[in-house]
Amino acid sequence: MGTNHDEKTKDNRITEEAFLQCVAGAVTETRGVYSLGERMGDSLYQGFTGRRSLRKGIKVARGGKGIIIDIFVVVEYGVHIPDVAFNIQTNVKHALKEEFDLKIETINIQIQGVHTTRIKR
């Protein structure tokens, strides 16, 4: 009987990888987003390990009322940045609610750059 309780608890835990993939998927599927940006230390991690950080462009912390998420992005040239930021927040909240039923306190969006397409002449 104790084993069933332990298995149920284990099944209900959210892995960091699943959480980050859910957030990253919601962000990159948002219209106007070119890519996730880089947090300080992401390139350092990659340099030492040779692997990309799962946390690329995403910082997560616990707040008093729920989870606080900082998301760093590069947007496409010509988009209305406030709309893109709002849509990222909406998409991430929806994805996390749908997938994990989590209480989100804040989602902060930081625009790190604007991607432009080079025209060859």
Regions found by a protein language model. Give the residues of each.
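Contiguous, often N-terminal, cationic amphipathic patches that form binding interfaces
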Residues: 1-81, 86, 98, 104-121
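Glycine-rich active-site/cofactor-binding loop and its immediate structural neighborhood
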Residues: 93
